[in-house]
């Protein structure tokens, strides 16, 4: 079976900051996210609504006020429920932004195992976790900062190249 047909390709402009971040209110448009995987890590903060994610064919119910983590090359799909009010923030980035090309103890011990998918990373964190609010607020700050950077750069582009 050719799994590359499920590969989702993301364009990440690494000249600015190697991260894509966007807000989604897709519940009013679609209630399924079809099977795919990608080379980048993905973090999704579900603000409203719920979803059943199938990760490597195993279903996981995720309610609002949850944060999901997908390491690179993890096969996943989803079905939304409560989709009349489904909103989320999505962050996709290449794990190379946290990796150093110079060997050091911290990279070798902590970062490399994440990049090489050798760590059992938590799949989701919900509002019952003590660190949920701090992580959620950090993600929202990253989203705001990314939006401001994109808008700032767009002001220097000719009108025909602006996408914002």
Regions found by a protein language model. Give the residues of each.
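Generic protein-terminus/edge-of-domain signal
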Residues: 1-67, 73-74, 108, 119-122
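A hydrophobic/aromatic-rich effector-binding and dimerization subdomain
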Residues: 2-20, 75, 79-143
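Basic, amphipathic alpha-helical hairpins
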Residues: 140-150, 161-164
């Amino acid at each position: 079976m050719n799994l590359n047909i499920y590969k989702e390709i993301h364009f990440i402009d690494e000249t600015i900051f190697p991260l894509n971040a966007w807000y989604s209110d897709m519940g009013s448009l679609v209630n399924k996210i079809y099977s795919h995987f990608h080379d980048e890590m993905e973090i999704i903060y579900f603000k409203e609504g719920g979803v059943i994610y199938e990760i490597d064919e195993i279903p996981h119910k995720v309610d609002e006020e949850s944060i999901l983590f997908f390491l690179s090359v993890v096969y996943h799909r989803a079905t939304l429920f409560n989709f009349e009010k489904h909103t989320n923030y999505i962050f996709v980035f290449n794990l190379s932004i946290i990796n150093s090309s110079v060997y050091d103890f911290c990279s070798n011990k902590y970062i490399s195992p994440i990049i090489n998918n050798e760590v059992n990373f938590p799949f989701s964190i919900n509002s019952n976790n003590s660190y949920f609010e701090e992580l959620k607020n950090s993600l929202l700050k990253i989203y705001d900062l990314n939006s401001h950077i994109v808008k700032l750069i767009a002001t220097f582009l000719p009108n025909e190249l602006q996408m914002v």
